[in-house]
Amino acid sequence: MELRFPRFSQGLAQDPTTRRIWFGIATAHDFESHDDITEERLYQNIFASHFGQLAIIFLWTSGNLFHVAWQGNFESWIQDPLHVRPIAHAIWDPHFGQPAVEAFTRGGAAGPVNIAYSGVYQWWYTIGLRTNEDLYTGALFLLFLSTLSLIGGWLHLQPKWKPSLSWFKNAESRLNHHLSGLFGVSSLAWTGHLVHVAIPASRGEYVRWNNFLDVLPYPQGLGPLLTGQWNLYAQNPDSSNHLFGTTQGAGTAILTLLGGFHPQTQSLWLTDIAHHHLAIAFIFLIAGHMYRTNFGIGHSIKDLLEAHTPPGGRLGRGHKGLYNTINNSIHFQLGLALASLGVITSLVAQHMYSLPSYAFIAQDFTTQAALYTHHQYIAGFIMTGAFAHGAIFFIRDYNPEQNEDNVLARMLDHKEAIISHLSWASLFLGFHTLGLYVHNDVMLAFGTPEKQILIEPIFAQWIQSAHGKTTYGFDILLSSTSGPAFNAGRTLWLPGWLNAVNENSNSLFLTIGPGDFLVHHAIALGLHTTTLILVKGALDARGSKLMPDKKDFGYSFPCDGPGRGGTCDISAWDAFYLAVFWMLNTIGWVTFYWHWKHITLWQGNVSQFNESSTYLMGWLRDYLWLNSSQLINGYNPFGMNSLSVWAWMFLFGHLVWATGFMFLISWRGYWQELIETLAWAHERTPLANLIRWRDKPVALSIVQARLVGLAHFSVGYIFTYAAFLIASTSGKFG
């Protein structure tokens, strides 16, 4: 028989309908379900695909460097980072008329270009790159790494180089190598780069391979390190009037604890950053020697887990059985990795704007907005994925005998209590927050704004005060100049930090009021409800009171026929599917809040946010409508401007989003009938009937149509907001 797609599933390959194609694509990466798969081959395939992933990442970053070097304006941007607009790449579009060519010719370019809102210019400048040649060199190096990764992936699929199953299951060795090798050594190497290349560059000294060994990064070299006088490395830091990239006001320190921001660049001190990375390297290099391998020293993770029995005996057998459960389940490991990565990505979003580490990026408002929004959305998708694979673990890999009465089993035993508590918290947050917003709306509508219910976030203000913010007059801990906490840190690091916290031009500890109180609770509602849906999906994945045998149906199933009182929409997949909508809406509130708060801060009219954010009409009118006006007017009978492309994307995003509903709110039979009518017409139309297809066309399954709908909803939603965000910010601030 001829080989048909998909080769990994003979059952699907013989399917006579178009289901073969769609199910083939859907299960292409579900290696576990493929014909003739063994546990060893599964691990080897995944391992090899990691190299492919790395190759793609290196190729992509290489492309960024290459296009900026070729078509960008890096060298002229460096001369004046605050006023020259950084160019991402040129645009060649045969549809452009003269007005379009003029509108998109910016940043000193000769023709139409795209502006970079990714922050790469600021990053490359901060780490010591200065010329187009530097960028080309970086691009070539990354291209080399990409090729190396591809070769590595291919090599590890060859019989001689395939790692064995025992190698993959050796958790202690992997942890040691990842902690020491991946995090420790790379952090140490990055500290080295900052000290040897980036910090000298920030002081006007150009260090490259040709003079790398001649230029001492510190006047006394390794002397202070070897004699134990480490504090010398912190002496004579850059002064507050230091001009970044020049010798003016430059010091000689390489590892400092200044705190706060460089006055000119509004970013963290490079010497503080180097110090931070050195500390991280130190911690991880030690951490990478903790676990017992073939040397017989260090901890055995299994022993650690088995020894952890909760006190009092009332919480079961603690972590017994967890080692084998985690080590033998790829889905459990992936779930843990995704949960960690999701949290880290969200933390990156929060820290990139509040503690900016790249020179001048804090004054590039559109880039700040784009990076915050980008990282929050990425975090949302990664976190929902963590719960998806947690649910798949419970269905495919969980063994009740191995986990008797341990924490996993007890989570399942207590799932009703967990789910109902989450439900109660979500209901409480939702009704109270909405109640306050709607009450305030009504008061404004009736012309009595003074009757709004406005709650000051006193606990959050108290926390900000404890960290040194004096605005609220709490006089506590670091905001109390006479207290022991304040005096203890004074010589060490406090002056820079306290100045930064109380300087109202940055995003560190923004002043908060009733509008912030309300939107924080709206976001808390979104987070708790998303979590409720995801946790319920995972805890009910194996079975529920309604459907005790759910695990036998797999991760995703539409229904189990008409019986049992209705078993549709209760697969773990359905929970994930619903949670993604909540995740997107929650991040919508998060990004609306962040963006509006910052727009008013940057424009110097914070009172607009403070006054309008306490009722829903304020959000709709003074944030969404007011800031989309330029977009809605992007191209009109009087010509076009550089926002036109965003106006088009705004419309296009709405279109994609709305298309999602066609798949989400429909029934399979309708499509099947429509498809058969279209196929009938096709077969009876001259010329068209010369083209035949081998597979009988059938409608998508219910689950597939939901996936397609969800994809359109998500992509359209994000496209629409991206266009709104970039256009409304760049339209105001350039």
Swiss-Prot record:
Gene it is expressed from: psaB
One annotated GO biological process: photosynthesis
Main location: plastid
Ligand binding (chlorophyll a B3): M662, Y670
Residues given in the record as chlorophyll a B1 binding sites: H654
Pfam families given in the database record: PsaA_PsaB (PF00223)
Keyword Secreted assigned: no
Entry keyword set: 4Fe-4S, Chlorophyll, Chloroplast, Chromophore, Electron transport, Iron, Iron-sulfur, Magnesium, Membrane, Metal-binding, Oxidoreductase, Photosynthesis, Photosystem I, Plastid, Thylakoid, Transmembrane, Transmembrane helix, Transport
A single MF term (Gene Ontology): magnesium ion binding
NCBIfam families on file: psaB (TIGR01336)
GO cellular component assignments: chloroplast thylakoid membrane; photosystem I; plastid
Biological role stated in the UniProt entry: PsaA and PsaB bind P700, the primary electron donor of photosystem I (PSI), as well as the electron acceptors A0, A1 and FX. PSI is a plastocyanin-ferredoxin oxidoreductase, converting photonic excitation into a charge separation, which transfers an electron from the donor P700 chlorophyll pair to the spectroscopically characterized acceptors A0, A1, FX, FA and FB in turn. Oxidized P700 is reduced on the lumenal side of the thylakoid membrane by plastocyanin.
Subunit structure: The PsaA/B heterodimer binds the P700 chlorophyll special pair and subsequent electron acceptors. PSI consists of a core antenna complex that captures photons, and an electron transfer chain that converts photonic excitation into a charge separation. The eukaryotic PSI reaction center is composed of at least 11 subunits.
Annotated [4Fe-4S] cluster binding sites: C559, C568
Annotated source species: Oryza nivara
Record-stated family: Belongs to the PsaA/PsaB family.
Membrane topology: Multi-pass membrane protein
Domain of life: Eukaryota
EC number: 1.97.1.12
Uppermost EC category: oxidoreductase
Lineage: Eukaryota, Viridiplantae, Streptophyta, Embryophyta, Tracheophyta
Name assigned to this protein: Photosystem I P700 chlorophyll a apoprotein A2
Compartment list: Plastid, Chloroplast thylakoid membrane
Comment on bound cofactor: P700 is a chlorophyll a/chlorophyll a' dimer, A0 is one or more chlorophyll a, A1 is one or both phylloquinones and FX is a shared 4Fe-4S iron-sulfur center.
Catalytic reaction equation(s): reduced [plastocyanin] + hnu + oxidized [2Fe-2S]-[ferredoxin] = oxidized [plastocyanin] + reduced [2Fe-2S]-[ferredoxin]
